[in-house]
């Protein structure tokens, strides 16, 4: 799309109210360091909708085996890979951040009252103080019903000084891993879950697997 090919940044303000002009000026002039993240995924075109990060897995090879064209559509109604233009959780800043390390509190958890804990160290490698939103996603690796490929379960915005490091603690109660089974019962199924830590849904920096008993 033209905007991504020709613009270094794209300012999204939604409904900013009567101070919208002042807030936009502060960001564009550098008086404020932006730190917002998208709460939706932006499609490449209207033909790529719906577009969302937490879609259900499929065996159709839809994302990697596209056929069809406007002249010969075959069974497709989308003629390009339907990846998002900008993904859920994405956002720019005047600061640059590195994800240095990630440690989980344990590798096994009790389904009754367990709490998954992660400690992430983030480094600001720029000359300007900035805020980063550390995001924790979880994927159920094997479940009795279809579940999304990942779900945002925790996040935290932290101020990281220029050339400094900050440790961020995130917690997810195991009860957050529950689903409705085929009998419409809300349960936490025992099994393995992948923990994903990153700056957006498509920029995962750390992955690890935990087990729920």
Q: How would you describe each model-predicted region?
A:
Residues 107, 128, 144, 176-178, ...:
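Residue-level signal for secondary-structure boundary sites
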Residues 2-131, 137, 190, 194-198, ...:
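Secreted, periplasmic, or luminal enzymes acting at the cell surface/secretory milieu
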Residues 173-213:
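Terminal connector regions
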Residues 143, 158, 196-200:
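Hydrophobic alpha-helical segments
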Residues 144-180, 184:
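Intrinsically disordered, low-complexity Pro/Gly/Ser/Thr-rich segments with frequent PxxP/GP/PP motifs
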Residues 115-117, 165-169, 205-207:
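Intrinsic-disorder/low-complexity, polar/charged segments enriched in Ser/Thr/Lys/Arg/Asp/Glu/Gln
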Residues 127-144, 150-152:
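Short acidic, flexible loop segments centered on an aromatic residue
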């Amino acid at each position: 799309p033209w905007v991504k090919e020709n613009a270094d940044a794209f300012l999204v303000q939604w409904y900013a109210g009567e101070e919208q002009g002042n807030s936009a000026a502060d960001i564009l002039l550098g008086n404020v360091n932006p730190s917002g993240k998208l709460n939706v995924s932006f499609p490449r075109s209207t033909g790529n909708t719906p577009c969302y990060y937490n879609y259900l897995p499929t065996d159709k090879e839809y994302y990697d085996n596209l056929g069809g064209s406007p002249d010969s559509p075959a069974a497709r109604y989308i003629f390009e890979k339907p990846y998002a233009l900008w993904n859920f959780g994405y956002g720019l800043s005047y600061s640059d951040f590195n994800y240095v390390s990630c440690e989980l509190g344990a590798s096994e958890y009790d389904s009754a009252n367990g709490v998954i804990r992660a400690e992430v160290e983030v480094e600001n490698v720029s000359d300007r103080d900035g805020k980063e939103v550390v995001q924790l996603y979880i994927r159920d690796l094997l479940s009795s019903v279809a579940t999304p490929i990942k779900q945002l379960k925790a996040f935290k915005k932290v101020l990281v000084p220029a050339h400094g490091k900050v440790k961020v603690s995130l917690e997810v109660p195991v009860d957050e891993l529950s689903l409705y089974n085929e009998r419409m019962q809300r349960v936490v199924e025992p099994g393995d879950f992948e923990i994903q830590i990153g700056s957006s849904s498509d920029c995962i920096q750390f992955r690890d697997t935990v087990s729920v008993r």
